Amino acid sequence: RLVGSEMCIRDRFLMIGSLFLLIANLPIESVSKVISESGIGDVCSQVYSSTFSLMAFFTVIGITYSYLKNDQVITAINGALTGLAAFILLTPSSKVLDSGESVTGIISKDWTAGQGMICAILIGFLVGYIYSLCVKKDISIKMPDGVPSGVADSFSSLLPTGIIITICAIIYAICHFIFNTTFAELIYSVIQIPLQGITDSFFGVIIMTVVMSLLWWTGVHGGSICGGILSPIL
């Protein structure tokens, strides 16, 4: 259900991105030439890049937010932003260019798009669980009654956010110093790539179809559930 809710949050951006991608690649040569020469194609490509290339961002925010809303956490939006911060912390911040030069201090769109989707799903659930647990255990800073609600919510989220970021920093350090990689790269190589091989097989397609049909039979939106899980893998 949480994955289905996340799909609903994410799909609006993907539909808009798809529309602009279609405009940039209209199968009419005369129109396509005008779009390309006028610079409209570059604008459409930028819109596409800012939607499809940020799918992992939308995913981690959507899953964390849906998890916390399901647990009736009032400061769910703060938890969702914490999930985003955790995701950025655990993904590569450098990239080697074709020239061999290494660029640091960046957020690579390679990892905010398809490559980072499984990592985003895992982080979304992990952050949602820890944040919700902190709220249930009343691990927060309480402010006096006269303090504005916005300020009080910020302080009440301080300890859960600090705990989550500290845990993610430890995970980052373990991956960096022991495995010489990042958490996102580790997940991609250990989980996502092998799963791609399974889902590309004949039996994988059969299993996906059966599971989707069973979900529909029980009254659950099989397309949203299976799509939310399988589209990142594919």
Regions found by a protein language model. Name each.
Residues 163-234:
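Generic multipass alpha-helical transmembrane bundles of integral membrane proteins
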Residues 1, 139-151:
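Intrinsically disordered, low-complexity non-transmembrane regions of multi-pass membrane transporters
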Residues 40-64, 68-83:
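Membrane helical hairpin/interfacial module
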Residues 2-9:
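Short, small-residue-biased leader/transition segments that mark boundaries at the very start
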Residues 46-55, 119-129, 201:
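Structural signature of hydrophobic alpha-helical transmembrane segments
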Residues 24-48, 85-115, 144-149, 181-197:
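Inter-helical loop and helix-membrane interface segments of multi-pass membrane transporters/permeases
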Residues 12-25, 58-66, 83-94, 121-132, ...:
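Hydrophobic core segments of alpha-helical transmembrane domains in multi-pass membrane transport
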Residues 78-87, 227-232:
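Central hydrophobic cores of alpha-helical transmembrane segments
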